[in-house]
Regions:
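An anion/pyrophosphate-binding glycine-rich loop and adjacent beta-alpha core
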Residues: 228, 234-341, 346, 398, ...
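FAD-site-proximal beta/loop scaffold in flavoenzymes
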Residues: 160-172, 177, 181-190, 339-383
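Conserved N-terminal glycine-rich FAD pyrophosphate-binding loop of Rossmann-like flavoproteins
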Residues: 38-71, 75, 243, 254-258
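N-terminal Rossmann-like FAD-binding beta1-loop-alpha1 element of flavoenzymes
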Residues: 10-34
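Conserved redox-cofactor binding core of oxidoreductases
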Residues: 98-192, 197, 204, 248-251
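Rossmann-like flavin
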Residues: 73-113
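Glycine- and aromatic-enriched mobile tails/lids
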Residues: 3-9, 25, 39-41, 47-48, ...
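Short beta-strand to alpha-helix junction loop
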Residues: 78-91, 124-142, 153, 215-223, ...
Length: 531
């Protein structure tokens, strides 16, 4: 078949805040391909309810306070240079978002209406109602569509990045100077894999929470960029730090899970087990108001000990009208499932929410592979360390997009397209039975990760996950070599790679720190604190 070869100065894989803001910042100097595996509205950015953290109210707040809050949340293993960079550059990037048409809520006096979230010492979260992410995403989409130099490829799915490996050179983890020449991208309309050649490639593919059964993320979050870079022998770091939201609505069959906000516990919600007993007093003096990771661990422990798959959140003691006024969306959603939250307990369970680790990058957003940058949730800048401070993620994406854009523009002229890249080998077919097996394997990955590499870990559980994933890996690689590339098989392959990375890096961290908690090493180790 006649396969397409497309050439762009910049190839951006992923279309959330990270990918789109990078594209907008470089498009005046060259052509940009924006690869988007679903529609532009399916990005994780769109679903970010909370807001975006930035010091704006200098009367009470300052950079030092925001830096300190971030370091404390990260359990002291954040990279101080990354923390300082994001926080000190945040205000100028907020201005850029406003220039692109983002509306942040203001008070009557014209100042920003700021929220305060767990772990922040001051009010510093800019927001747009309770759907900040959607406001940012839709504003960026408008800007991107208007820009003549940006071409959006919707329903195109990146399969592999192209390196010297594809020129027949042996590449290992120790090869110096691995270079990225573009990517092989599946056109879902034609079913063919096209070759995209670029001078600069950017990974902005988001997180990998869909490897867990319970997740608050859209199901496109399969860790594609992280897996592609890992297979190309790039460096991936801190994958053991997965943030779980303690209270997602438990309704089997609902994927992704509906988020029951923190604010509900602040409002006076009480956690109970299925025998209606309160249990937080066993775990923390702050009860239901303890920090996210403590509450998530307590719920997890309660469920595992009792062999149950959820707990209850109870606001029935509060004034019904007050409850409806404060939480109209939650009230409506629960009512549609036959739960009246003013009279009934809300079934909740923790769900995978955010990945702190990812593709290791420097202060310019460069990965360990030359000509390849990584931005947003798929990258690991060192900002989050062992745990992310609320609302620090959207701001990290745009600050690093800005640095990466400046760096990429300064080196663009050094590079050319590599014309020697072979076409993708497009042989193979797939039967319906094999499709069913792929779906089944995905469910198995979800169950392995949920049961053995969840909130509370142990050596025994991690070894078990490792062995199970190994079997799935062998089966899937054999299938992948035989069949034609499809989004399903590629996503499965990526999920297995990412599950393996989370498991292996969890095994290597022989301590409990940040979001990584293991019963075999329940305390932080002294050595790491000094690093």
């Amino acid at each position: 078949p006649n396969l397409m070869i497309r050439k762009f100065d910049f190839l951006v894989i992923g279309s959330g805040i990270a990918g789109m803001s990078f594209a907008l910042k470089v498009a005046h100097k060259g052509s940009v391909a924006l690869i988007c595996k679903a529609g532009l509205e399916e990005a994780n950015t769109y679903y970010a309810q909370g807001g975006i953290a930035s010091v704006t109210n200098l009367k009470v707040d300052n950079f030092e306070k925001h830096i300190h809050d971030t370091m404390v949340a990260g359990d002291w293993i954040s990279d101080p240079a990354a923390v300082e960079k994001v926080i000190c550059n945040a205000p100028s990037q907020i201005e850029e978002l406003i220039k692109w048409g983002v509306n942040f809520d203001k008070k009557d006096n014209g100042e920003f209406d700021l929220h305060k979230e767990g772990g922040h010492s001051e009010f510093r979260i800019l927001h747009h109602k309770d759907n900040t992410g959607a406001e940012i995403q839709t504003s960026l989409i408008e800007e991107v569509k208007r820009h003549p130099n940006i071409t959006v490829f919707s329903n195109f799915y990146a399969v592999e990045i192209i390196t010297q490996h594809h020129l027949g050179i042996i590449v290992t983890r120790h090869t110096p100077g691995i270079k990225c020449f573009g990517a092989y991208v599946l056109n879902e309309k034609t079913g063919e894999v096209d070759t995209f050649l670029s001078k600069i490639t950017v990974m902005a593919t988001g997180g990998c929470e869909a490897v867990y059964t319970h997740t608050t993320n859209p199901l496109v979050a399969t860790g594609d960029g992280i897996a592609m870079v890992y297979r190309a022998k790039g460096v991936v770091k801190d994958m053991e730090f997965i943030q779980f939201h303690p209270t997602a609505l438990y309704h089997p069959g609902d994927r992704p899970s509906f988020l029951i906000t923190e604010a509900m516990r602040g409002y006076g919600g009480v956690l109970r087990n299925l025998s209606s007993e309160e249990f937080m007093q066993k775990y923390d003096p702050r009860l239901s108001l303890a920090p996210r990771d403590i509450v998530a661990r307590a719920i997890d422990n309660e469920m595992k000990q009792r062999g149950e798959d959820h707990v209850y959140l109870d606001v029935t003691h509060k004034d019904p009208e007050e409850t409806k006024k404060h939480f109209p969306n939650i009230y409506k959603k629960c009512l549609s499932l036959g739960i009246d939250i003013t009279k009934d307990y809300i079934p909740v369970a923790p769900a995978a929410h955010y990945l702190c680790g990812g593709i290791k990058v420097d202060l310019d957003g460069q990965s360990s592979i030359k000509r390849l940058y990584a931005l947003g949730e798929c990258s690991c800048t060192g900002l989050h360390g062992g745990n992310r401070l609320a609302s620090n993620s959207l701001i990290e994406a745009i600050v690093y997009a800005d640095s990466a854009a400046k760096h990429a523009l300064s080196v663009l002229d050094r590079y050319d397209f590599n014309e020697d890249i072979p076409e993708w080998n497009a042989e193979g077919t797939i039967s319906n039975e094999e499709r069913i097996l792929i779906t089944q394997s995905m469910k198995e990955v979800n169950q392995i990760m949920e049961s053995y590499v969840g909130i509370v870990r142990s050596n025994l559980r991690l070894v078990r996950a490792w062995n199970r994933l190994d079997i799935l890996y062998e089966e899937t690689e054999r299938l992948f070599k035989r069949v034609k590339a499809s989004r399903e098989i590629c996503e499965l392959r990526n999920m297995i790679n990412v599950g393996y990375l989370i498991t292996r890096q969890a095994m290597e961290r022989k301590e409990s720190r940040g979001l990584h908690y293991t019963i075999d090493y329940p305390h932080p180790s002294k050595d790491n604190a000094e690093k």
